[in-house]
């Protein structure tokens, strides 16, 4: 169960990337394969929310940049997930 939104934002937290580079990075750090439809659908939604923005470039690959709003959202969601993991692991240990 992997949220493509968080995976894309986490990938861009390390620096600007185009779609294919994001797919490779996400596969490497999360062991999750995002198909092009899933990736580019999520990219469109992230752009609409102002969390990422495309960078003008000369070649046909369009790199994306994590905005300040996207960074804030990623930080908040990762903190929330960290809390969920902590609670979940604690409950498993008691079971």
Annotate the PLM regions:
Residues 75-95:
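Amphipathic alpha-helical dimerization/coiled-coil segments
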Residues 39-41, 45-46:
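Basic amphipathic alpha-helical segments that dock to polyanions
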Residues 1-38, 58:
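N-terminal helix-turn-helix DNA-binding core of bacterial DNA-binding proteins
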Residues 59-78:
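Basic, amphipathic "hinge/linker" alpha-helix immediately C-terminal to the N-terminal HTH DNA-binding motif
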Residues 47-58, 65:
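Beta-hairpin "wing" of winged helix-turn-helix
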Residues 22, 70, 81:
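Conserved anionic group-binding/transfer micro-motifs
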Residues 11-14, 55, 73, 77-80:
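Histidine kinase transmitter module recognition
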